[in-house]
Amino acid sequence: MKRLFLLRHAKAQPADGGCEDFDRTLMLSGMQDAAAMAHYLRKNEYACEQILCSSSARTTQTAELVLQELESEIDYRENLYLADAAKILAAVRGAPGHVSSLMVVGHNPGLEATAALLAREPVRRKERARHEALEEKFPTCALAILDFDVGRWRDIVQGGGKLVDFVRPKDL
C-alpha cells in the first residue's frame, strides 16, 4: 500500500508589487494553521517518510512547520512551483519504491486537481462527506490523504486512491 499526502501551502502574504510571487512568505495565521496541521498529523499518528516540496518561500515554510512534528526527509523541487496535476503526478510516480508514505507540499489549482484526479468514487457516507468537502474548496493549508492498493508509486492511476482524510484549518 502507498499513502499520499497532498498539502497546500498555508496562508501567505498577499500578492502585491512588493515581492515576486515565488518569494511570498506565510502570514502569522498561516504559520498557526501549518503548526495546527502538523499537530493533527502527529495526534492521528500519520507518518510520512518523504516530502516533495515546491521550492517557493511559502511552501518551504509550510513544510518546515510540518517537519517539527514529523520525522521526514524533504526534497525541495523547483518544478513543483505552481505545478499542474500532470507534473505533480509525474513527481509522485517517480518516488522511490521503498517509500510507502509521501507528502507533496504545493499550490493550487494543481493540488486540488491532483486530489480530484486520483480519488476514487466514494463508497461510504464518511468518504462521500470528504469528497464533498474536497469538491467545495481546497483552501490554504488543506490536507488530502489518499491510500492506494499498489506496490509501486508508478502504478498509481486515475481514480485509484481512497480519500481517507480531508482536513482544512477550519476543521481543527
Short names for language-model regions:
Residues 2-79, 83, 111, 117-125, ...:
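Active-site-proximal alpha-helix that buttresses catalytic centers in soluble enzyme cores
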Residues 4, 97-106:
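Generic beta-sheet signal
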Residues 37-41, 89-92, 130-132, 150-151:
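A generic local structural motif
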Residues 44-46, 94-100:
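Glycine-rich phosphate-binding loop signature in dinucleotide/nucleotide-binding domains
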Residues 48-67, 74, 147-172:
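Conserved histidine-centered catalytic loops in small-molecule metabolism enzymes
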Residues 80-97:
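Short phosphate-binding loop-to-helix
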Residues 119-164:
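Domain-level recognition of soluble alpha/beta enzyme cores
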